[in-house]
């Protein structure tokens, strides 16, 4: 019985090696500074920092819009 379990375990490890599983150390690091380069709403000339939105329509590229 034990030899059958050993053979089954060996086959499973050969088919699905532990290196195929992504561990936490293999994950990409989160880089908030890189993400902020794509989002430039705060630097938009029509952005109102008090309201935290734009008074103009969203079609001009400033989001979030104050107007519906």
From Swiss-Prot:
User: Which residues does the record annotate as propeptide?
Assistant: 21-52
Per the record, the domain of life is: Eukaryota
Cystine bridges: 53-66, 54-62, 58-65
Report a single Gene Ontology molecular function: ion channel inhibitor activity
Regarding tissue, the record states: Expressed by the venom duct.
What keywords tag this UniProt record?
A: Cleavage on pair of basic residues, Disulfide bond, Hydroxylation, Neurotoxin, Secreted, Signal, Toxin
Q: Which residues form the signal peptide?
A: 1-20
Checking Pfam families in the record gives:
Conotoxin
Compartmental location = Secreted
> Could you tell me which residues carry 4-hydroxyproline?
64
Q: Which family does it belong to?
A: Belongs to the conotoxin M superfamily.
Entry domain remark: The cysteine framework is III (CC-C-C-CC). Classified in the M-2 branch, since 2 residues stand between the fourth and the fifth cysteine residues.
The identity of this protein, by name, is: Conotoxin TsMMSK-021
